[in-house]
């Protein structure tokens, strides 16, 4: 991408973030990871929403998009899911745990009320 990752004091962390993302992809591919569950709203791991600016400020701002590591995982062929994709995670649990039934009321993050009100529309890469 074209974005930069800046630390709380304005230090450019982009190169380190890319280095970490590359390491994450190599490790995931070596371990034959098929699905990564990552923390959304993160400059590294956001799958739908990322911080706009430093995450340590009193009032955070957000934008639609994917984090550095998420973008690299997607490019490496690894599916990424947000920890807030409750419906998808519950459906996966149904497959892994006989007898578990996902609630029909669960929603994935793109359907969350806050997400819909503050950042309408889906990010094309998510």
Language-model region placement:
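Short catalytic/ligand-binding loop motif for oxyanion handling, primarily in non-cytosolic enzymes
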Residues: 44-47, 89-91
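Divalent-metal-activated hydrolytic enzyme cores
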Residues: 2-23, 27, 59-126
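Glycine-rich phosphate-binding loop signature in dinucleotide/nucleotide-binding domains
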Residues: 28-32
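Short, well-ordered beta-to-alpha junction loops that form the rim of enzyme active sites
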Residues: 39-43, 85
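Structural motif
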Residues: 34-37
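Surface-exposed, active-site-proximal loop segments in enzymatic domains
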Residues: 5, 46-57
């Amino acid at each position: 991408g074209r974005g930069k990752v800046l630390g709380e004091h304005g230090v450019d962390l982009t190169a380190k973030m890319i280095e970490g993302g590359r390491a994450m992809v190599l490790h995931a591919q070596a371990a034959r990871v098929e699905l990564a569950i990552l923390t959304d709203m993160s400059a590294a791991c956001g799958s739908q929403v990322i911080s706009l600016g430093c995450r340590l400020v009193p009032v955070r701002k957000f934008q639609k998009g994917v984090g550095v590591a998420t973008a690299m995982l997607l490019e490496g062929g690894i599916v990424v899911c947000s920890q807030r994709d409750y419906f998808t995670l519950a459906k996966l649990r149904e497959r892994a745990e006989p007898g578990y039934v996902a609630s029909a009321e669960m929603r994935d993050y793109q359907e969350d009320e806050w997400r819909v009100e503050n950042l309408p529309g889906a990010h094309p890469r998510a």
